[in-house]
Each structure stands twice: as structure tokens, then as C-alpha cells.
Amino acid sequence: YGWPATSFGINYSGARITPLTSAEGITPPVTYWTPSIAPSHLLIYQGALFEAWQGSFLVSTLVDQDVKRLTLNDNSVTDSESLFSELGARIRGVHEGPDGAIYLLTDSDPGSVIEVRPKTVDSANEP
């Protein structure tokens, strides 16, 4: 895909990795973040628990400390939202369980695995 020959990124020093953002024969990214969100994992959600998210790309991030949910259509991002930022933790991984539950792996100290399920009417009324 071109990195590091082409890039929208910058080094830790602030200098551009390369002045080129495109070149012949290199497929450009569908999306990118500048400054970097430090994406750490990508999942295409296929589960049934979060039906509205089926086919969405879930991108865990270290810098933004969230999961980006991206909706793609015809190879372009048509919608994006930030999820789980209230955790206040760097999210290293996002995984889907066999029943469609989502598992987040944080690398904060101490690291943890967080299971995410839809809130049910019954659990909303529990103390």
C-alpha cells in the first residue's frame, strides 16, 4: 500500500515521513488520521448482538483511547463514531466473541479485558 514511500504521517520529531502522499501504482488509503490515532487493531464486526454494527469496521486506538466505528460504502467511509472513550484507557485490541459480544483489551496499568454487551431492559433496572 505504499508506506513508507507514500504517507500522510509524521515522525515523532514532527517531520513528515515522506513528502509524497500518492504515487503511481500505490493504492491510497480509504481513510487516515492526522495526527495519528495510533490504530492498534481492526475488526469487521459480523455478530448479531449489535445488529446495527454488522459489517462495520471497529478500529481500536491508543492515542484517542477509544474504538472508531467506521461504516464503508463503495470503498469510502460514510460514517464514523467514537465508542468507549469513557473508559479512559488505551485500547490495544477489539475482538468479537462467538456469540457477538465485543471484547476490548486495554494496555493501561493494570491491563484488562472488558466484555461489551448491549444493555437489556432488565439489567437497566438493576441497582
Describe each region flagged by the PLM.
Residues S123-P127:
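Boundary/junction segments of secreted and surface-exposed precursor proteins
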Residues Y1-E81, A89, D99, G111-S112, ...:
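Beta-propeller domain segments
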